[in-house]
Amino acid sequence: MAKAAAPRIRKKERKNIISGVAHVLSTFNNTMITISDAQGNAIAWSSSGAQGFKGSRKSTPYAAQVAAEDAGRKAREHGMETLEIEVSGPGSGRESALRALQAVGFNITSIRDMTPVPHNGCRPRKRRRV
């Protein structure tokens, strides 16, 4: 009987990209960070949930900081040095994700707020009464 061929695992190739864009999406429940090249191809990504935070802990600034540090480390492995940052969403992890990316050692050239603002479009969800 022939021996079954083991599945081949391809090692990630090391891309040599010097500058890129960090997309930080901070919602009320989670924070997602994707670092891409100038064309928009994802190089590295991370989120609060991917770092092991569950439930309401995902929406904390600390969880956003841990996720940003992880995505930043992955991007530095590909040779990335300078970043433009695009932040969108109303969540609490926006500022801490920015500081974490700066702490990893990136040279940040610009910060843009890409949060979509409606010109009185859809009806908003009902207000919370606590």
From Swiss-Prot:
Q: What is this protein called?
A: Small ribosomal subunit protein uS11
Top-rank taxon of the source lineage equals Bacteria
UniProt GO molecular function: rRNA binding; structural constituent of ribosome
HAMAP family with a match to the protein in the record: Ribosomal_uS11
Q: Which lineage is the organism of this entry classified under, starting from the top rank?
A: Bacteria, Pseudomonadati, Pseudomonadota, Alphaproteobacteria, Acetobacterales
Q: Does the keyword RNA-binding apply?
A: yes
Alphabetical keyword list: Ribonucleoprotein, Ribosomal protein, RNA-binding, rRNA-binding
What role does it play?
Located on the platform of the 30S subunit, it bridges several disparate RNA helices of the 16S rRNA. Forms part of the Shine-Dalgarno cleft in the 70S ribosome.
List GO BP terms, alphabetically: translation
- Give any Gene Ontology cellular component: ribosome
Family note: Belongs to the universal ribosomal protein uS11 family.
Q: Origin organism of this chain?
A: Gluconobacter oxydans (strain 621H)
Subunit structure, interactors included: Part of the 30S ribosomal subunit. Interacts with proteins S7 and S18. Binds to IF-3.
Checking PROSITE patterns in the record gives: RIBOSOMAL_S11
